[in-house]
Amino acid sequence: MDREEPAESECTLRALVEEYNGACKEAPKEMSKQFTDYNTFKRYTTSKKDHAPQMRLVYSVRKPWPISMTPSKEIPLVFNGTKLKDTILDLGESKRTRANIVVPDYWSKYGSQTSLEVVNAILYAEDLKVQRFFSTEWGEIRYGRMLPFRKPVQACPTIEEVNPASIPHTLLQVFCPQYTTLDSKRKAHMGAVEKLKRVMEPICKVQTQESAVHIARSLIDSNKKWLPTVVDHTPRTAEMAHFLCSKYHYVHTNTQDLSDTRSIDNLCGELVKRSLKCRCPKETLVANLDKITIQGRPMREVLADHDGELPYLGICRVAMGLSTHHTMKIRSTKFSILNSDHPRIEVKKVFSLSPDVQVTIPYRRFKGKAKVYFQNDQIQGYFSCTDRQIDEIKISAPKNAPLLEPLLDICYYGSFIEPGFEQTFGFYPAGKREFVDSFFMHHSKDHKAFLIHMGLDKDLSLPLSPELNWKEPALSKVCRVTELDSTVQPYTSATREFVLGETLNVYTQHENGLELLICPTEIRSTRGPLPPGTNLSGSEFIDIYQDPFSRAKSLLKSTILHAERCKEFVGNMLEEYQDPAETTVQSLVPINTWGKSAKRKLQEEITSDPDWHQCPRKRAKMSYLAIIAGSIQDRDKKQTNVPRAFMLRGSQIEYDMKATRGLVVDTTNRIIVGGETVLREGKGGPEGYVQTGVFEEQPRCYLVDTPDHGLSMGLSRFCVHSQGRYFQYEKKISIWEETDNIKATIDSQRDLKRRRDIEEMVSKRARIV
């Protein structure tokens, strides 16, 4: 038997090798895939942890009092000889007690029954998950096998996703608004607050404060789950795969970390904002995207891996030739055009206070018929319109859901009601942003304009009440608003191409023109963290993530080393044109009164020497004046002369105009910026000379102005005075011919090698003896 076992093992191994080779031939594409290429997961446990959930359950149950509960007289201390709860009431800071594992069984048998409202509130999140599950359209059955590898999956929250920094303020606003400060109220997500109050009101009556807060947090906080990946297989292994993985379902997952996608959108936003200040925004954005890397990967590859409905990310994806989303977002409502006769046209309305005081506020409206899909959380549907008139609105929404906010978003999207577009709100508008805020504020307080636009009817079968609550009993109902009886998907029948305009507007191709999708000047966003590992050293927007010293150093290096860039920068600061470094300049210089004096000096220098930008020393001086000219001025104070030096804002670094100390130092042969030599004249000394010493007093040799001057005079030895010291140079003199020097070097190397060989041989013989 011992002799037969190796033969059997060999046969088994050969059979396995043949099976493996057969699988490789049948599906070469699948075999070449990496496990990170898959986005389908098998969920086999309800635990959020990834290690032995059943063992943790065992350890919890084995405790004498595994359950904590609020004190209740309905549960006795002892029942049929079994102790149900402990006598200790205070556990830490909460008034709770511990109970036996059988207490839930006792309560289900003898406890009081709660109301249906409380049950529905507690099961609200789980009901939504079940509804989503059964509304999913399943694809055809696929077989798979498990790999011992898990990937992080972002689980979307049930109610609404809230920024992690806003979650504590949102919860404070829900549970104890009387203790919140104005700053905390501003940071809270008010949309989530209203939804949470409706859901949590019945729960707070039966749950403890800690438990209710925990439930509320889980409804608005997105968490990561580590789920194992599933790898597709070939028919050869289908039987085994079906046996192993028959009881699983596929769940919709997001393999990208949403916080990572937001950080990339933050980076894209900084790039777009700075590119818009350049003379060629589109070319500038594309050129800089090609120079940026994130964790060693080019920006183009990173953008290809991240998709979504974030606006700045969409602009950069289109700039790189990639696709993006088809939706436009207004506040919390997403819109997607299903079909339309023409793209939305722009109308510029001019409001005049006097012949000399006018403001132009543009808005967009439909021309002809259009059908648009919209979605706001659980509220979705579509509306049909003709020009600025709504024909009908089909909506699917929960019962008694307030629809004021999404309906106002619809009215703003299509410019359907007034005032807000052709009419003012009783005062002269200062700008578009203020006009938009006034639109929502005005119509939120009084939605009479929407009711007049749609009309009222006594047909009580209609679902929308005059208070704009869904299926609320009322004496009259809103016309032309009906319930959506079939599912609508926001997909168009034809694939449309994306076009990036010169001002970084994103358009979609329409048979009759271009449809505006993303306008960067209308995006409202706040600064957020950049993706880790971002390298901006190759781009011209290196100031995005640096401190004042590094920003100033990068700016001055670019202007001192590049003549054309310095000429453009000085011209932009002098004429008050937009420049990529405008934000950097305003962040470096304190608010001052030196602007007019700096501009006057710049004009004098340019007039006296038109070729000033060819000299690096003049570029350094002009950069100093241009930075002051482009800084923020204090208009309430009298203008003063340019100072010789000033401190950079937020630091103790001095910037000197004459470049004798501080940030920029100019020696006779070097220009040093931030301790780094950026320009050196006569590097290495004149040709044919070598530096032989540095002295505090003048040595016995001829003193010249520059090393080139000494070279032109043909001196064998001379010195140059620089920075209080004397640098001595001597002419290189060789007493041998060049060929003799080479031959002597080779001979000396051979002699050295022979000597080492002899010494090694002698040492070996000495050891043997």
From Swiss-Prot:
<comment type="subunit">
    <text>RNA polymerase is composed of three subunits: PA, PB1 and PB2.</text>
</comment>
<protein>
    <recommendedName>
        <fullName>Polymerase basic protein 2</fullName>
    </recommendedName>
</protein>
<dbReference type="InterPro" id="IPR048838">
    <property type="entry name" value="PB2_627_dom"/>
</dbReference>
<dbReference type="Pfam" id="PF21442">
    <property type="entry name" value="PB2_627-dom"/>
</dbReference>
<dbReference type="Pfam" id="PF20950">
    <property type="entry name" value="Flu_PB2_4th"/>
</dbReference>
<comment type="similarity">
    <text>Belongs to the influenza viruses PB2 family.</text>
</comment>
<keyword id="KW-0506">mRNA capping</keyword>
<dbReference type="GO" id="GO:0075526">
    <property type="term" value="P:cap snatching"/>
</dbReference>
<dbReference type="GO" id="GO:0044423">
    <property type="term" value="C:virion component"/>
</dbReference>
<keyword id="KW-0507">mRNA processing</keyword>
<dbReference type="GO" id="GO:0042025">
    <property type="term" value="C:host cell nucleus"/>
</dbReference>
<dbReference type="GO" id="GO:0006370">
    <property type="term" value="P:7-methylguanosine mRNA capping"/>
</dbReference>
<comment type="function">
    <text>subunit of the RNA-dependent RNA polymerase which is responsible for replication and transcription of virus RNA segments. The transcription of viral mRNAs occurs by a unique mechanism called cap-snatching. 5' methylated caps of cellular mRNAs are cleaved after 10-13 nucleotides by PA. In turn, these short capped RNAs are used as primers by PB1 for transcription of viral mRNAs. During virus replication, PB1 initiates RNA synthesis and copy vRNA into complementary RNA (cRNA) which in turn serves as a template for the production of more vRNAs.</text>
</comment>
<dbReference type="Pfam" id="PF21490">
    <property type="entry name" value="PB2_cap-binding"/>
</dbReference>
<feature type="short sequence motif" description="Nuclear localization signal">
    <location>
        <begin position="753"/>
        <end position="756"/>
    </location>
</feature>
<keyword id="KW-1157">Cap snatching</keyword>
<dbReference type="InterPro" id="IPR049113">
    <property type="entry name" value="PB2_helical"/>
</dbReference>
<keyword id="KW-0946">Virion</keyword>
<keyword id="KW-1048">Host nucleus</keyword>
<dbReference type="InterPro" id="IPR048837">
    <property type="entry name" value="PB2_cap-bd"/>
</dbReference>
